[in-house]
């Protein structure tokens, strides 16, 4: 993920809406997955941005899970993680890397849309399967949600793709 898509200017009421949305997603997962059996957790696409209540929200909510692992192309300094691989989820993984971060529960929250082509998306899913022992969750942004969740700007993502991408470069 590129850092340029994350707006540093957040609006409190919008962050509350985003946080509420992430809380609903956490509740959905909690209803569907027996988290009491989960001993290790892998977050795909962890962000280095910890400045806002909605940043890495699920990682914080899963604090009762003993082992937290992360894969990110960003530099993650958070001490919450037991193991961090700084690489793309579409990269090839060695047997040692797989064994190091393979987890009971693997989640990708709004990452798959950043890996590019359909081929890369398939590679990401294939890698996630290799890195997951029991449960794998892939979530992507709902295009019809009124707030663009990376920049936290209302309606930005409804612009034509070319204008949207151009505007992201200025943020």
Model region roles, listed by residue range:
Residues 135-162:
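Conserved class I S-adenosyl-L-methionine
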Residues 4-12, 79, 94-95, 101, ...:
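Short, structured coil/loop segments at alpha-helix boundaries
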Residues 166-171:
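A conserved mid-domain beta-alpha-beta active-site/ligand-binding segment of alpha/beta enzyme cores
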Residues 1-36:
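Class I SAM-dependent methyltransferase Rossmann-like catalytic core
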Residues 32, 39-145:
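Conserved SAM-binding loop
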Residues 58-59, 154, 165:
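Transmembrane helix-loop junctions in multipass membrane proteins, especially transporters and channels
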């Amino acid at each position: 993920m590129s850092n340029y898509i994350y707006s540093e200017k957040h609006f409190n009421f919008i962050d509350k809406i985003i946080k509420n949305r992430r809380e609903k997603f956490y509740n959905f997962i909690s209803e569907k997955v027996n988290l009491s059996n989960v001993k290790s957790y892998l977050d795909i696409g962890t962000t280095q941005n910890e400045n806002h209540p909605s940043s890495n929200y699920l990682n914080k909510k899963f604090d009762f899970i003993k082992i937290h692992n992360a894969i990110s192309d960003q530099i993650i300094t958070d001490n919450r993680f037991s193991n961090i691989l700084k690489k793309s989820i579409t990269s090839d993984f060695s047997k040692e890397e797989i064994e190091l971060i393979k987890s009971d529960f693997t989640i990708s929250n709004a990452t798959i849309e950043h890996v590019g082509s359909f081929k890369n998306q398939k590679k990401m899913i294939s890698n996630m399967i290799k890195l997951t022992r029991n449960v794998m969750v892939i979530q992507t942004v709902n295009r019809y949600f009124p707030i663009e969740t990376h920049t936290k700007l209302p309606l930005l993502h409804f612009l034509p793709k070319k204008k949207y991408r151009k505007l992201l470069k200025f943020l």
